[in-house]
Regions:
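Ribonuclease/tRNase effector modules and their secretory precursors
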Residues: 1-99
Length: 99
């Protein structure tokens, strides 16, 4: 698997972003092609999040939020954990915390 980055999150868990997931997030046919300019912020959301919300129906999923003051929005980075490590599933901007 080709990896864009692997990072240790705020709670000490390894999380990676694969090339396949990055393509899914940023492709012109996706809902979030503007995310190509937010790679550094995605890393920051994982290491210094404003908030982490674990999904209520699936505790193997969490949303990491980073508030971007200049834009008045949150960057949401979705993560799924398998065998203790995580991988980024999605990333996009939102005006409010979703969960």
């Amino acid at each position: 698997m080709d990896v864009i980055f692997e990072i240790v999150d705020k709670s000490g868990r390894k999380i990676h972003l694969s090339k396949e997931r990055w393509k899914h997030i940023t492709s012109p046919s996706s809902l979030h092609p503007y995310m190509t300019n937010y790679l550094q912020e995605i890393k920051e959301a994982l290491t210094k999040p404003s908030k982490i919300v674990t999904h209520t129906l699936d505790n193997k999923k969490a949303d990491y939020y980073l508030y971007i003051k200049e834009r008045g929005v949150y960057l949401l980075v979705g993560v799924k954990y398998l065998n203790g490590d995580g991988f980024v599933t999605t990333a996009f901007l939102t005006r409010k915390l979703i969960r």
